[in-house]
Amino acid sequence: MSASPARSRVSPEIIVVCGCLIALITFGPRASSGLFQLPMITEYGWGRDTFGFAIAIQNLLWGVGQPFAGAVADRFGAFRVLCVGALLYALGLVVMAYATTPGLLHVGAGVLIGFGLSGCSFNLVLGAFGKLLPEKWRPMAFGAGTAAGSFGQFLFPPIGNVLIESFGWQQALLVFAASVLLVMPLALALATRATGDSPQAGPAAVPNQSIRQALAEAFKHRSYVLLVLGFFTCGFQLAFITVHLPAYLKDAGLSAAVGGWTLATIGLANAVGSLASGWLSTRMSKRWLLAWIYLGRSVAITAFILIPASPVTSILFGISIGVLWLSTVPPTSSLVMLMFGTRYMAMLYGFAFFSHQVGGFLGVWLGGLLYEINGNYSAVWWLSIVLGLASALINLPIKEQPVVREPALQPAE
């Protein structure tokens, strides 16, 4: 028998709305980071590799912190983790605003924002959805939470662009910092602590299964390992494009506004793609859905870099890559929950997300490094294409079924 689900006095509708607002608020400033690259390096005389390395640290530490934040949320509830994460995130934006040296930039934009995101991003929201919502709500809620983060990417870059042009990049970062603090009151709706697996079509629950047992079980499961490996590409592509696309378009002779609106278009298209992915996750094979997403990204990137850049091609690329942007999240999170249940979902999805963020670290860092070496981004664009094709193949052998647990498995002492 599965343990009873988390009890909440908050209706599912309110849980979803508050969780989606948290995802929107926390994803927006992070998705706008590319807008600050040229103003900051111009003012301080840094290279693009300096800014890129700071965001690379952010991606890596977001990934490093995610499993631990997920484990704490699984044990004690999401509210405290979300509040601490929001405080670190806001502090990181403030430090970034006043960073006059590469070291301070790396601390603010890298360390503080990275760990802050691990504690308050949409990944924690999805884990809370898995525990607090009835089973029938979950796939669409995963899509809605991901789409809300995507809408943050649509909403914040144009706002950031206007703030930078009107008040300067430092003031824009301070406004973003204030907005992140809104996460704290919204997190009250996700404050319930779950006591075990919620009823679902998944593996038989193991009473008092320890974190160590859960991790050992997961990393011995071939399908989970393949899922984790495939997610690396998602992070590589997304982080590289988020940070370096505005500069790539500026190098092509386009205005900064085109870069901002292209990022915004990605966010808006992603909202549609994430909702569609959540819906499709309930109606088709999740591994095939992931394979088609990764293949589609490679096709979109290939077309974009082979066609001369213009405002029209930039927006069209934003639409095509945006539909596929975070559409990997609903099938990935659903597969983790299908394989292992809800009890340690936030932690196990966190380890998958760590792979995602290692990819993000390399995508951002290599983007800046290879630009300084070669004077262009061509090598990283082509690497993104190859990785997309590889991940499409990696996901195909995944078995969409719960992990087999021996009835005689004993609980932890």
What are the language-model segments listed below?
Residues 31, 59-67, 153-154, 267-275, ...:
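Residue-level signature of mid-helix packing/kink "hotspots" within the transmembrane helices
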Residues 33-37, 219-274:
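Extracytoplasmic gate region of multi-pass secondary transporters
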Residues 40, 119-133, 327-340:
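Intracellular juxtamembrane helix-capping segments at the cytosolic ends
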Residues 65-77, 274-285, 372:
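Helix-to-loop junctions at the C-terminal end of transmembrane segments
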Residues 87-100, 296-309:
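C-terminal ends and interior cores of transmembrane alpha-helices
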Residues 104-120, 232, 313-327:
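Hydrophobic core of transmembrane alpha-helices in multi-pass small-molecule transporters
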Residues 109-147:
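Cytoplasmic helix-loop-helix junction between adjacent transmembrane helices
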Residues 145-196:
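Helix-loop-helix hairpin linking two adjacent transmembrane segments in secondary transporters
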